[in-house]
Amino acid sequence: MSNRQLEIEGLIKCLGADILPKNAWLMLFGSQARDEATPNSEWDLLILLEGEKESNDDFDRWMFSFISLGWPLGVENNPVVYTYDEWRQRQITPFYKNVMKGMVELVS
């Protein structure tokens, strides 16, 4: 991973630790996690929440915070949010298998 990628990953980790609820899990997946990224690759983020989803305002705040973090850096952050139960129900999907195969835990 380049110094720039390490810097961006560090900023994502810090933001996640600051804004996500206790017991949330933040993972990096896709080409950035597999160390196959090009300079234009986006940052794919999976956020898992314990229990029920929070209010729509909280949900929007988390999504917007991660997306807007990338703007001054010239990178695209793509967060997706599920509860742990919703995520477990996706175990048979190719998306689940792809994420779990090459993910990097950022916040837990």
Which residues fall in each region the model found?
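Catalytic core of pol beta-like nucleotidyltransferases
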Residues: 1-27, 33-39, 49-108
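Short, conserved active-site loops that position catalytic residues or coordinate cofactors/metal ions
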Residues: 41-43
